[in-house]
Amino acid sequence: MSSHALAKPQGWGGGISPLATSHGKLFMWFFLISDALTFTGLLVALGFFRHKFHDVWPVSTQVFTHFPFTHAHLPLVYVGWMTFDLILSSVTMVLAVEAGHRKDQKGVLLWMALTIVGGAIFVGSQVWEWAIFINGSHEGKMINQVINGVWQLAPFRGANLRYNEYAVTDTGMSVPHYADFFFCVTGFHGFHVFSGVVINIITFTMAYRGVFERRGHYEWIEKVGLYWHFVDLVWVFVFTFFYLL
């Protein structure tokens, strides 16, 4: 029997690596697909409840009008800034991956650091937005609202899980689902961004210590980049379906 016939295929365990990629990147794709299905379920549920309560469902352009250190009426400007920041961090991640392909350690460190900063700014911005959404931004903690069909001044308690100031029916019964979905969807996505920042910090540390130089490749950067781009892409859908529509 020839030596060629005895040769085993190079790859992992049972055969040649499928799709011409490493098992690490393949499993990352599996994870991202399953995670995408979770976000899809949340956004579909949001659409269902929005349709069911369309008569009292708040208009996001009238809800998210705040901006730090000002009292101006700026619909979605702050959320737009958050979106721009996250997209910009995706660009810096692309540059970090490209530097990894060139085995440019300094380039990887620079662009990963900027990606970390961008992600941290987004998380901090979301914390501020949550605080305003929960506690309210009106002076005196009072707000005009409809109670039993009559406009009157009522205590202002913010839009928390037990009370939704923005969705009040003509019977005075509040519909808290807007706040429920706001905390659930943005919180779940925010957790992903926070996790990504932590992973990016770990990656930066590994690059600084020369781990990838010793390995001879920067594939880890590519896998982290896939996750970060996924998080950015999901936010585009969240921004569109929750804030714009």
What are these regions (language model features)?
Residues 1-245:
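...captures the hydrophobic TM-helix bundle architecture rather than a specific catalytic motif
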